[in-house]
């Protein structure tokens, strides 16, 4: 499969829906994870990503709770961390994977208990990925048989030896439509940029301006296991900690400067 420019691909696609990108940095020492959501209806657009640090992930929440019409299928945990295993999905199957892997089951075992979303006639696919401590990863899509709500098709993709500077992308939809056609084929292979900033900003700026809602990006250091996150939200949250972040502690030099200013005022 030929490598694509993922940013160009997304820029030319009005509505890929929700998407997962996993890649190994060009230096081979880091893994990148990206997950975005889009929306066409007011209910789908009324969302933000909010950190859930105690579970090593994020949740979706209503930007304005007063405008929330139907929480099913749009309020869930897209990202959770189990030890040094990072789980990302487009629905509540994140918790299914987390719970069953906690019991010693596999990624595939967990997803064999699930099917596509019950939102006919679209029957939105469930897309999922898991990144392991050594940088290997797996992806999956659970979709209907060409819109047949009585038939599920489960696809799994293993990447045990990821190549530095490359990644794979999968989305719920092929493109916009009515009903919306599901993603087809294996995950798309793409060239990975050098830094998480380039990766995240490239994805966010490439998504359709009208339909994009939120983006999450994570970098994982393969040696230490430490990770760092970036979150982009198009809409402001109402009554959320996102509106009032904690002020970081002042550096010693900043404290010294304030002390001098106070002395001058006296």
Regions found by a protein language model. Give the residues of each.
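Conserved short alpha-helical segments that host acidic/polar catalytic motifs at enzyme active sites
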Residues: 1-266
């Amino acid at each position: 499969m030929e490598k694509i420019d993922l940013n160009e691909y997304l820029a030319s696609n009005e509505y890929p829906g929700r998407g997962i990108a996993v890649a190994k940095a060009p230096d081979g020492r880091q893994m990148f994870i990206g997950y975005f959501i889009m929306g066409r209806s007011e209910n789908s657009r009324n969302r933000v990503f909010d950190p859930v640090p105690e579970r090593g992930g994020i949740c979706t929440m209503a930007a304005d709770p007063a405008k929330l019409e139907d929480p099913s299928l749009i309020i869930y945990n897209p990202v959770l961390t189990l030890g040094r295993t990072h789980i990302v999905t487009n629905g509540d199957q994140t918790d299914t994977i987390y719970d069953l892997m906690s019991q010693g089951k596999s990624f595939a075992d967990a997803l064999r208990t699930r099917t596509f979303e019950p939102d006919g006639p679209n029957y939105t696919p469930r897309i999922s990925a898991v990144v392991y401590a050594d940088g290997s990863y797996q992806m999956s899509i659970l979709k209907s048989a060409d819109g047949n709500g009585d038939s599920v098709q489960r696809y799994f993709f293993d990447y045990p030896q990821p190549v530095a500077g490359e990644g794979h992308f999968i989305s719920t939809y092929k493109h916009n439509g009515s009903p919306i056609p599901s993603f087809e084929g294996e995950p798309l292979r793409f060239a990975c940029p050098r830094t998480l900033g380039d990766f995240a900003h490239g994805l966010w700026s490439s998504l359709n301006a009208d339909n994009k809602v939120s983006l999450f990006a994570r970098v994982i250091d393969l040696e230490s296991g430490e990770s760092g996150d970036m979150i982009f939200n198009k809409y402001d949250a109402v009554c959320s900690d996102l509106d009032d972040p904690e002020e970081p502690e002042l550096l010693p030099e900043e404290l010294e400067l304030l002390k001098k200013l106070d002395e001058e005022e006296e």
